[in-house]
C-alpha cells in the first residue's frame, strides 16, 4: 500500500512540476504589458522591450525598410510602414501579432507606394503614401483601404488624426508645409457623401517631425534644414511664431502628455545637439541633451514621467526622466533604431 501511494505521489508530483514548468515557460513567452516597441531599421526587425528591465524579450521580422510603427488600440497588433523611399517605393505595411510575437501577412496597398507615417484612430489605420501624394485609411475589419485623399504636397510624410476623427494633419517634407485636413459639414438631405478641405501652411524647409498640442489648439512643426520650429494656430490656420532651436537635422517633435513641454530630436549629431526640451508656454529652452549620436523616434509613457528616444547613430534607446530631466538608462538595440511605440494592453 505504501509503495502504491509513493508511486502515486511521485507521478502526481511529476504532473504538478510539469504544469508549473509549462506555466513558467508560457509566462516567460508573454509580451510584457506595458511594452516598448523599437524598430531596428537596418536589421529590418522589431524589438519588443520590457520597460521594467530595459531588456529585449523578443525580435520579430518587420518587413523591408521599416520606418514607423503604431499599435492597435487593444495592443494586440502592431503596424509598420515599409517605406523604400524614392528608389524602391514599397507598397506594404507589415502586421505583427504582439500576443504571439510573430509576423502576419502584410497589407498590400497596390498602387499606393512609399508608405511612411501611421496613425491608429477610430479602429482604423491611417497612413501616408509619399509617391502618390496622398493619405489613406485601412479598415482591419474588412481588410481593405476604404478611403484615400490627396494632399497635393511633395513627400507627405507624417500623419496625426484628431480624437473626433474630423481633422487630420500631415507634414510634407519637400513642400515644407503642414496640411490641416478638415471634414466639411454635410448639408441636410445631401446624402452620405463626405467632403474634405485641405489647408497647406508654410512651415520651413524639410518640415518633418510635428505634433498637435494635447488641447488641440496648436501645431508645432520642426524644420530639419532651418533648425527652427514653426507654431501654427489650428483655428486660424496661420503660423504665429518661428523659434530657433539648438538641434541640427531635426527629426521628431513630441508634446508631453500634459502639454507643458516639447521634446525635439535631431539626427545632425554633435555635442549637445541630439535632444532639446522646450517649455510650451514660454517657448524657452529648458534643457539640452547630448545622447552621443543622432536621435530619431520619441515616445512618452502616458503619465509623462519619462520619454524614450531612439539614438540611431549609437544603436540604443535612451531613457529620459522628465522629472529630474536626466538620462536614467538605455536599451541596447540592433542597428539604427528609429520608430518607437508604447503598448499598454487592455485588460
Give the positions of each predicted feature.
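Bacterial N-terminal signal peptides that target proteins for export
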Residues: 2-15
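Predominantly soluble domains enriched in secretory-pathway, periplasmic, or organellar proteins
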Residues: 20-347
Amino acid at each position: 500500500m505504501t509503495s502504491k501511494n509513493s508511486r502515486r505521489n511521485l507521478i502526481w508530483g511529476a504532473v504538478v512540476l510539469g504544469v508549473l514548468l509549462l506555466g513558467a515557460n508560457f509566462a516567460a513567452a508573454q509580451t510584457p504589458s506595458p511594452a516598448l516597441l523599437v524598430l531596428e531599421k537596418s536589421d529590418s526587425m522589431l524589438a519588443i522591450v520590457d520597460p521594467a528591465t530595459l531588456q529585449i524579450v523578443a525580435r520579430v521580422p518587420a518587413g523591408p525598410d521599416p520606418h514607423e510603427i503604431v499599435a492597435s488600440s487593444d495592443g494586440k497588433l502592431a503596424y509598420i510602414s515599409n517605406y523604400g523611399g524614392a528608389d524602391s517605393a514599397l507598397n506594404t505595411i507589415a502586421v505583427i501579432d504582439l500576443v504571439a510575437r510573430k509576423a502576419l501577412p502584410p497589407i498590400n496597398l497596390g498602387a499606393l507606394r512609399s508608405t511612411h507615417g501611421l496613425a491608429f484612430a477610430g479602429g482604423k489605420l491611417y497612413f501616408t503614401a509619399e509617391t502618390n501624394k496622398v493619405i489613406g485609411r485601412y479598415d482591419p475589419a474588412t481588410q481593405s483601404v476604404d478611403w484615400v485623399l490627396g494632399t497635393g504636397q511633395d513627400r507627405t510624410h507624417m500623419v496625426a488624426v484628431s480624437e473626433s476623427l474630423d481633422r487630420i494633419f500631415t507634414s510634407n517634407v519637400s513642400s515644407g508645409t503642414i496640411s490641416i485636413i478638415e471634414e466639411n459639414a454635410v448639408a441636410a438631405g445631401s446624402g452620405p457623401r463626405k467632403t474634405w478641405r485641405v489647408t497647406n501652411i508654410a512651415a520651413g524647409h524639410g518640415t518633418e517631425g510635428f505634433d498637435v498640442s494635447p488641447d488641440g489648439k496648436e501645431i508645432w512643426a520642426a524644420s530639419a534644414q532651418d533648425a527652427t520650429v514653426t507654431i501654427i494656430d489650428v483655428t486660424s490656420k496661420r503660423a504665429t511664431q518661428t523659434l530657433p532651436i539648438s538641434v541640427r537635422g531635426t527629426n521628431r517633435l513630441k508634446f508631453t502628455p500634459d502639454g507643458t513641454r516639447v521634446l525635439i530630436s535631431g539626427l545632425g549629431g554633435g555635442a549637445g545637439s541630439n535632444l532639446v526640451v522646450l517649455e510650451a508656454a514660454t517657448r524657452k529652452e529648458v534643457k539640452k541633451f547630448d545622447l552621443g549620436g543622432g536621435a530619431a523616434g520619441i515616445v512618452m509613457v502616458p503619465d509623462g514621467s519619462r520619454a524614450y528616444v531612439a539614438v540611431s547613430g549609437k544603436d540604443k534607446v535612451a531613457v529620459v526622466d522628465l522629472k529630474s530631466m536626466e538620462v536614467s538608462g538605455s536599451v541596447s538595440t540592433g542597428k539604427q533604431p528609429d520608430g518607437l511605440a508604447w503598448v499598454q494592453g487592455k485588460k
